[in-house]
Structure formats: structure tokens, C-alpha cells
Curated annotation (Swiss-Prot):
It comes from the Eukaryota. It comes from Schizosaccharomyces pombe (strain 972 / ATCC 24843) (Fission yeast). Changing C976Y: In bir1-46; temperature-sensitive. This is Chromosomal passenger complex protein bir1. Changing A990T: In cut17-275; temperature-sensitive. GO terms for biological process: cell division; mitotic sister chromatid biorientation; mitotic sister chromatid segregation; regulation of cell cycle; regulation of mitotic cytokinesis; signaling. BIR repeats lie at residues 25-99, 120-194. Residues 288-299 have a biased composition (Basic residues).
């Protein structure tokens, strides 16, 4: 057997729709004899094939070719052992019919599967199944397929549906039929309803699996060796269940509950095969390794004891205790207390903690700590401290919290005391102070690597407290006795390097807590010292700013960077302010000297910009010499310059050159005045438009001394000044009020606006304009009259053409046109107010009527009457009458569209022949038919209640309404039939008439 791939699926034509029927497919094998014994025609027809032989001379002879009606695929060269269904589904797996038949014999295939339902739905071919688009029926293709039916029509029943599982055929479907219920009611034992999966488990197995919490998929997998749990003995035998890989991973990932204080010997005894491990590391259980797979890297889990929620202990205390060795002088009592806290796992109250700490630590002990101990630097311990002190390591979180608190308190107090208090103050402190710096301060002060002085205790012979910042030499720290600045070298000599114990004890913190009250009192005094007004600070730091050499020497000696505090910054700002004031005073004095002594001859206006520039240079140079920023100083002296420099006025002498005059005008925010033809305009120099327009300058007028600068601006249109306004001067009153300068007053006095010559010229121009406008108006009126006359002529000629062409079609109307033109010309020569009538048209029309041959009497009579009425009623209107108004009555003339059309111009030729009549005199008298009456429903005659028949009286209301509707419908049908018969008769008459023509 060989298949033929179809090029494309053919459409469902009529022949293909017939092949849906099994009997039709079987008939194709009988019409043309099937050449083979096997496979039989019956089997081929059931599979969906119909006989389609190919016997053409050009191609091969395929006498055993068959084609599927559903997928249109052809097969030929059949053999005896071929199975048609198997060949069909193998070579055309997408065929719905083959898929349905193959699934019928498969017990593992669910009949109600979605794929089978879709294939069954495709068998109900459109335009073949009669209930496709019938909403009143419940037999749509999707519903039939979901009920288990396929379409299998027969010769007797075209709506037959067939079930392949129970071989039932149902046809003659009604609107109320439900296919699913009908199928189940007739064949309840059909496989479509009773199918069960043979591979499914029984209910007892499912219930067992649900109670045992085992996945059904896990039972099908092979058993594997599971890791032994550490709590159970390895000698015992356990039942092993095979879990899925995900469950294996979850089991291996479970944390094992192990105690921190377990005995390692017991573990070794219980697990002899495993390598010995440390007690802190857990025992790792791994699954057996599979072949050809690399082992995954698993991180060992670290198990920690469970701690109370409200404990002050840190998570890493175990690591610290294990890694850091204890010092020699630690007692066993502290270890017992610490172990007790870990084992009992109960948080201690605050009172209990204080009691234990007082019991452990003696009150007379004192501890010296350094930052080098915190950062990891080893220091030599004092033997006396080791012998006296005996305590355990407190929890780390308590140490850090207390250290941070004390650092914040000490750093604040020491910063305030170092900025205000002097070194010479004597305070008798019997106790030593702790000074520990934060990591941020350590980063700033790490430059001196030789000393490693990140934080230390400072002890003098007199036991005076010194600042906790040894590396920073602040400028405000001065010696009270000498009044000079303490250099870093001298300060370095005072530092005492002491040996401290490696660990900070609670004694230090107890001493610090006792001293808080005294330090807070000192802090309040320091804050009051900080609230000193600025004038006192000026006096305080005046000596520091004057002694430059001392500052330089002190900074050169110290290799460490100078740290500037807030008070030092305020001192620098005060010094800047004083320098600027001194410089400004000096510059003012220099300006006065220059203006009085050197430049007495020159005017003041020339000297102002030069002195301002010099003053700026002096101030900038003075600030740069100090080595300070010029940004702040510029903002200060700019305002002072603006104050003492006088703004230039408009009254400037002619001696100034052009460049200086422009500079002065740009700097000063003054009003520039431009006087053009006696019209004043004000402008602001700061606007960008005025700056662009101010470039065009008349140097001649500037030298003449009338104005400062005559700027020609074309921004605003200049108002036209009438001569009467010039005389009265009212145009000046209408302008906006402003202060007029002396120069402007001079210009108004010297201007020639109010001179008698200019007034006479303006009067002459006004008279000339009046004469010109009057001439133009006269010309316009004359042109308007001529246009009106021409339009009237055109309309008259159109009327003549239409009327006379209908009356006398054989002659041209030239005389009438010329006569009308002559008449209109004579009218145009006369005055426009007179009204004239055209009398020559009467003569022309009378002559033409007498000589008209072969014209109808009706048309000639109509033309006479119309021409007389039209000509006598024409009155030429006056020239000043608008053209939009009609000058004759259009309703009288039947030729309104012709008169107003643009096709009949005065010189266009007119038809000479008369049009033939559309209908001859012998035409049959057609009756007018109104077809709209057929569409209207007939109105029944009102029935009187007295004339009701006996039948109607016996009826109910509903029956009587139905009876009346039927009666009206019958009458309407009769009326329609009568009209149809009449139309048919008239149609026959029309046909006979046309044939006779």
C-alpha cells in the first residue's frame, strides 16, 4: 500500500458531503468493480474510504486507489495482509475519523477525553448536520460530541447520530431532546458512561496511602538505601520506604537536635564506622552517590544552643570563648556562673545581675584600658592587677554597649572642655579617667605611626585632666599662664605611656558611672562658656590672629595635621570680616586722596569706573594674600561699591568718549529717552530688546548737545498726530506721567513742532487728502453704476432668448438684442435716478409674431401674453440699489432656472428647432396608479356590537381577537389578489401596445 499526500484539503463540495454516508461510500465500490479481494469494500468504507480509481494515459494507472472523505488522503497498491485502519492512522494521524476508530479498541483511552470530543465534533460537518445553527434545538455539534455521538447519516435519516461504543443510532431529534440523557436512558451500560482506568488503584489502596502520607508515585520507584538517623541504633532493622528525590533531599536537610555538651565517647561507641569529629561540628549524613554524577558541595551545618529571647548574650559568644584563651587570674566561680546561665537557659533579672557582679568584683580595683587592646595590639599587663583582679569575661554585648555609652559621654565633655577651658585649671581628681576613641576618630588620627596614640590615659604630676585627642592641636587651646599657643611637640612630651591590662573589667565601668554626676555638672558650665557673644570672642582670638610667626613655627614642628574645631572656624570668619572692613576703609581713603590731589582737573564721572575697578583689584589681591577664598569676600564688597558709587544721570557733558558713555549707560538702570518727531518714548535699559536696538546711534545729534543718545527704536508704532492736536498740545497730556529731565525740557523748547510753517504744511496735506478721497469715491460710484447696467442688459437678453425662442424657433433674435443694448446705452448716459422703459421690444415682438410660420396656436398665444407682461413690467432700477434684490417677479415666469443658470450667456446660440412632443395624441389613456396603498395594512370596518353573530357572542375575548385577526388577514389577502390581477391585466395591455408600435 502506498499513500498519496494531498496537496491541500479540498472544500466540502456536494460529492464530499455525500461521502459522509456509509452507504454512499459503499456504492462507489459497486459502481466500478473493486479489483482486489482483500481488503474488502465493507472494511474500507467503515474506515472512511471511498473508491477513487485513477486511469489516465499520462499518469500511472491506480485502479485500487481509495480516498478518505475526512482527511482527503489517497492510498493505493493494497496488499492482502494490509490493515486499512492501521495504515490510515499511521500515514494520516491527524484524521479525526481514524483517531476515533482507533481509540474505540483501546481500553486505556478515556471516551470522554477532550481530544476525542474534539474529533467527534469535527464529524458533524457544517451544512450537512441540520441542527448546526438552530438555537431552538439542543443538538449542536459540541453537545452531540460531548454525549458520545458521531455523525453517521443514512439514506432514510439525515440527522442520524451513532455511538461507536454501544452501536446505537438516534435520529429525528426534537427541540426538547437532550442528547446526553437520551443516550444514557437507552444504553446506561455503555462504555462511554461506565469506563474506568485499569491502572487506577482500588479505594482501599487509596485510603491506605492517604493515611500513611506516602505519594502514590513513590511506590513505583525502586527501593534505595536510606541514611540511618543518629537517634536510632544502627543495629536495629527498620522498614525502608522509597521516597521521591525531593523527599530525600528534605530528609537530609532536616536539622538534628544535638546538645552542645554531649560526650564524644558515646558517639564513638554508637558510630564505630564513622571518623571521629569535634563536638561542635555535626554529623553529616549524605545519600549514596549515583554513578556518573559529581558529588554536590554541601556546607556543614553549625548547630547552636537555643537561647532565651530576652538574653543580653551575643550569638558569637561561643566562638569567642573557644578561640580566646582565658587570663591567669580568672577564678572558677565565674566559669560556674557562666556555665550555669548557658545550661539553664533562663534570663537573669537586673537585680540578680548587679548582685552577682558585686559579689565577683571588689570595689577598690581600678583598670587602665587602651584602644590598642580593642584593636588587637598586645600590651604588657601589671602583675598587681592580675593578682588583685579575679573575674570572668562578661558577655560581649554588655561590654560593647557600655563602651559606646561612655565614649559618647566622654567625647562630648572633652570636646567642650578642650575648646573653652585652659590647661592651667587645677582639678584634684583622685580617680583616673578612661578615654576611648571611636573608629571614626582613629581613622583621622592614624598618621603618627611611631607612637600609636589612638587613645590613652594622660597623667600629669599635678593630676590635671587633658583633652582625649592628643593628635589634634586645636587653635583655641592656649596656656593660661603664658597666653601663648600649645604646640604639638610640647603637648607630646606631656603624654604618659602606661601599661594596661588586656581586658576591661567591670570596675572601670563602675567608676565611670560614679563620675557621671560630676562630669554632667562640668558640661553645663562648659555650655555656658560657649554662649559668649561674638565681640568677646573677637577680643579672645585677637592675639592668636596677630601672632602669625608663632602659628607657623608651631605648625612646622608638628608633623600631624591641624584639626580645626568650631571655635577656630568662627575665629577665622571674624578675622576675614575685620580684614575686609580694614581694606574697605583703606580703599575709600585712597579714593578720596586720588580724587582730591591727582585728578582735580578731570571730571568726577570719568574717575568713578576707574576707581571702582582699582578698588575691586585691591580687595581681591588683599584676600588672595591672606590665602582665603574670594567667593565670600566678593559678595560682601559688591554691595558696598554699589552704595558709595553715585548712579550717573542723563545730564552728561559732551566731553565723554563714546565707549565710556556706553559703559555708564549699561551699568546704570536709567531711562533712555528717544525723541522722534515730537513723540516721547520711555524704555528700560535692562530689557534685552532695548539693548539690541540701542546700537544704532546718531553721533551728529549727540555732538549737537540736544540729547544724550538719540536711539531709533522700531518697537512700537508711532501714533499719528493731527494738526489740531499739535496746536493744542493735548497729545502730551495723553502720554503716561513721568519725570521729565532738564535735557528733555530743552529739547521740547527747541523743537519746531509748534512752528507756524509746520502747521501750514499739515493743513495743506489734509486738504489734498480730502480732494483725493472725494475723487476716488466718485470713480467708485461710476464704476458701480456701469456694472449694474451691464448685469441688467445680460438678464434682459436672457429673457428675450427664452421667450422668443419658444415662440419663434426658426428665427434668430438679433434685432431685439441690439435694440435692448441701444436702449440701455441711452439709459446709462442719462442720470441714474430716472426710470425708463424699453419700447422697442414691443415692436420687435409684434413683427416676429406676424411672420412666424408653422407654430402651434397654444404656444404662440402663451408667448404673446407672457412677452407683453414681461416687457411692460420691466423697470430699470437706480444705480445705487443693491444687486442682491430682484427687480422683477420670478414667480410669474416659468423659466426661473433658465434665467438664473450660467449656461445661457448673451452671445450663446439658441436652438432653432422645436422639441418633439414626448407622447402622441393617439396614446392610450393610462390611469395613475398609487402603489403605496399596497404597503398599507387595510383598516377593518368598525364592527358594531349590535351586529355580532352568534358565534362571536359565544367566543371568549381571546378567541374573538384571534377571529378578528384572521378575518382582517383574509380581507387583506383578497384585496391584494384583486390588485395583482389588475396589474397583470395592465401589463398585458402594455405588452400588446409595445408590440403594435
Amino acid at each position: 500500500m502506498k499513500p498519496i499526500t494531498s496537496s491541500s484539503k479540498r472544500r466540502w463540495n456536494r460529492f464530499r458531503r455525500e461521502m459522509c454516508n456509509y452507504s454512499k461510500r459503499l456504492d462507489t465500490f459497486q459502481k466500478k468493480k473493486w479489483p482486489r479481494a482483500k481488503p474488502t469494500p465493507e472494511t474500507l468504507a467503515t474506515v472512511g474510504f471511498y473508491y477513487n480509481p485513477i486511469s489516465e494515459s499520462n499518469s500511472e494507472e491506480r485502479l485500487d486507489n481509495v480516498t478518505c472523505y475526512m482527511c482527503t488522503k489517497s492510498f493505493y497498491d493494497w496488499e492482502d495482509d494490509d490493515d486499512p485502519l492501521k495504515e490510515h492512522i499511521t500515514h494520516s494521524p491527524s484524521c479525526p475519523w481514524a483517531y476515533i476508530l482507533s481509540s474505540k479498541n483501546n481500553p486505556n483511552q478515556n471516551p470522554q477525553a477532550a481530544a476525542l470530543t474534539k474529533c467527534r465534533e469535527q464529524t458533524f460537518v457544517d451544512k450537512v448536520w441540520p441542527y448546526t445553527n438552530r438555537p431552538d434545538y439542543h443538538c449542536e455539534p459540541s453537545v452531540m460530541a460531548a454525549s458520545g455521538f458521531v455523525y453517521n447519516p443514512t439514506a432514510d435519516a439525515k440527522d442520524a447520530a451513532h455511538c461507536l461504543y454501544c452501536d446505537i443510532n438516534l435520529h429525528d431529534w426534537e427541540p426538547d431532546d437532550d442528547p446526553y440523557t437520551e443516550h444514557k436512558r437507552r444504553r446506561a451500560d455503555c462504555v462511554f458512561f461506565t469506563w474506568k482506568d485499569p491502572n487506577s488503584l482500588s479505594p482501599t489502596k487509596l485510603s491506605f496511602l492517604s493515611t500513611s502520607n506516602i505519594d502514590p508515585e513513590d511506590l513505583t520507584e525502586d527501593n534505595s538505601i536510606l541514611p540511618v538517623s543518629p537517634t536510632r541504633d544502627s543495629t536495629k532493622s527498620h522498614k525502608t520506604l522509597n521516597f521521591s528525590p525531593s523527599r530525600k533531599n528534605n530528609l537530609n536537610a532536616r536539622p538534628l537536635t544535638m546538645s552542645l555538651y554531649t560526650n564524644t565517647s558515646e558517639e564513638k561507641d554508637s558510630q564505630p564506622t564513622r571518623a571521629p569529629q569535634s563536638p561542635t561540628k555535626p554529623v553529616l549524613l549524605t545519600a549514596p552517590r549515583r554513578k556518573n554524577k559529581s558529588p554536590k558541595k554541601s556546607k556543614p551545618a553549625v548547630f547552636k544552643p537555643v537561647k532565651p529571647i530576652f538574653s543580653d548574650e551575643d550569638e558569637d559568644d561561643d566562638d569567642l570563648t573557644a578561640s580566646q584563651p582565658f587570663s591567669k587570674g580568672i577564678c572558677n566561680d565565674s566559669m560556674q556562673v557562666a556555665k550555669k546561665n548557658f545550661t539553664e537557659e533562663i534570663p537573669l533579672k537586673e537585680d540578680e545581675k548587679d548582685n552577682e557582679l558585686e559579689h565577683l568584683v571588689s570595689p577598690a580595683t581600678s583598670v587602665h584600658t587602651t584602644v590598642s587592646d580593642i584593636t588587637g595590639h598586645q600590651s604588657v599587663t601589671d602583675e598587681s592587677d592580675e593578682q588583685n583582679n579575679c573575674m570572668s569575661t562578661p558577655p560581649k554585648i554588655e561590654i560593647e554597649s557600655k563602651i559606646e555609652e561612655e565614649i559618647s559621654v566622654v567625647s562630648k565633655s572633652k570636646e567642650i572642655s578642650s575648646s573653652v577651658s585652659s590647661v592651667g585649671k587645677e582639678q584634684n581628681h583622685t580617680e583616673k579617667q578612661v578615654a576611648i576613641e571611636t573608629p571614626e576618630q582613629q581613622k583621622v588620627e592614624k598618621e603618627d605611626e611611631h607612637l600609636n596614640l589612638q587613645g590613652s590615659f594622660i597623667e600629669e604630676s599635678t593630676k590635671q585632666p587633658i583633652s582625649s585627642k592628643p593628635s589634634t592641636s586645636s587653635p583655641d587651646m592656649t596656656d593660661a599662664a603664658t597666653g601663648g599657643r600649645v604646640s604639638s611637640s610640647s603637648f607630646r612630651d606631656k603624654i604618659l605611656q602606661t601599661n594596661f591590662s588586656p581586658r576591661s573589667t567591670i570596675d572601670s565601668f563602675s567608676n565611670i558611672s560614679k563620675k557621671r554626676n560630676s562630669e554632667e555638672a562640668n558640661d553645663e558650665n562648659d555650655e555656658t562658656n560657649l554662649k559668649i557673644p561674638i565681640p568677646e570672642k573677637k577680643r579672645k582670638f585677637q592675639e592668636v590672629l596677630q601672632s602669625k610667626n608663632i602659628l607657623v613655627s608651631s605648625t612646622e614642628d608638628s608633623h600631624e595635621p591641624v584639626k580645626v574645631t568650631e571655635d577656630s572656624q568662627t575665629a577665622i570668619h571674624v578675622s576675614k570680616f575685620e580684614d575686609l572692613e580694614n581694606k574697605s576703609m583703606e580703599s575709600e581713603q585712597s579714593l578720596q586722596l586720588l580724587s582730591e590731589s591727582e585728578n582735580d582737573d578731570k571730571p568726577l564721572i570719568d574717575l568713578i569706573p576707574l576707581l571702582a575697578i582699582k578698588r575691586k583689584d585691591n580687595l581681591v589681591s588683599g584676600v588672595l594674600e591672606k590665602g582665603k577664598s574670594t567667593s565670600t569676600s566678593k559678595t560682601k564688597f559688591d554691595t558696598s561699591i554699589v552704595d558709595f558709587i553715585e548712579k550717573p544721570k542723563t545730564e552728561i557733558s559732551e566731553v565723554l568718549p563714546e565707549e565710556k558713555r556706553k559703559a555708564i549707560c549699561d551699568e546704570s538702570q536709567t531711562v533712555r529717552v528717544s525723541i522722534d518727531r515730537g513723540v516721547t518714548k520711555t524704555r528700560d535699559v535692562s530689557s534685552p530688546v532695548s539693548d539690541e536696538k540701542s546700537e544704532n546711534v546718531n553721533h551728529e545729534e549727540a555732538n549737537s548737545g540736544h540729547t544724550v543718545m538719540n536711539v531709533h527704536s522700531s518697537l512700537d508704532p508711532q501714533p499719528i498726530v493731527q494738526p489740531n492736536e499739535l496746536e493744542s498740545g493735548s497729545y502730551l497730556k495723553d502720554l503716561p506721567d513721568r519725570n521729565v529731565g532738564n535735557s528733555e525740557k530743552v529739547t521740547f523748547q527747541e523743537d519746531d513742532i509748534n512752528s507756524p510753517k509746520l502747521q501750514s504744511k499739515n493743513n495743506q496735506t489734509v486738504e489734498a487728502v480730502n480732494t483725493e478721497t472725494s475723487d476716488k469715491l466718485q470713480e467708485k460710484e461710476a464704476n458701480h453704476e456701469l456694472e449694474n447696467i451691464e448685469k441688467i442688459e445680460e438678464k434682459l437678453t436672457e429673457v428675450d432668448k427664452v421667450s422668443l425662442s419658444d415662440a419663434f424657433p426658426d428665427q434668430e433674435i438679433k434685432n431685439s438684442r441690439t435694440s435692448v443694448q441701444n436702449g440701455t446705452r441711452s439709459v446709462s448716459k442719462n442720470t441714474p435716478e430716472k426710470e425708463t422703459k424699453v419700447d422697442k421690444i414691443d415692436n420687435v415682438s409684434k413683427k416676429d409674431v406676424e411672420t412666424s410660420p408653422g407654430s402651434c396656436e397654444t404656444s404662440s398665444a402663451f408667448a404673446k401674453t407672457y412677452a407683453e407682461k414681461e416687457v411692460t413690467s420691466i423697470n430699470l432700477p437706480s444705480v445705487r440699489k443693491p444687486l442682491d434684490e430682484s427687480y422683477y417677479d420670478h414667480s410669474i415666469s416659468p423659466f426661473d432656472p433658465l434665467c438664473q443658470s450660467s449656461f445661457l450667456a448673451p452671445q450663446t446660440p439658441v436652438k432653432s428647432k422645436h422639441a418633439l412632443p414626448l407622447v402622441e395624441a393617439n396614446a392610450p389613456p393610462w390611469e395613475p396608479i398609487d402603489f403605496s396603498s399596497l404597503l398599507e395594512s387595510p383598516v377593518p370596518n368598525p364592527v358594531e356590537p349590535n351586529k355580532l353573530s352568534e358565534k362571536e357572542l359565544d367566543m371568549t375575548v381571546e378567541q374573538w381577537i384571534k377571529f378578528m385577526y384572521a378575518k382582517c388577514a383574509k380581507e387583506f389577502e383578497e384585496a391584494c389578489e384583486e390588485k395583482i390581477e389588475w396589474l397583470l391585466e395592465e401589463g398585458k395591455r402594455a405588452e400588446e401596445y409595445i408590440q403594435n408600435l
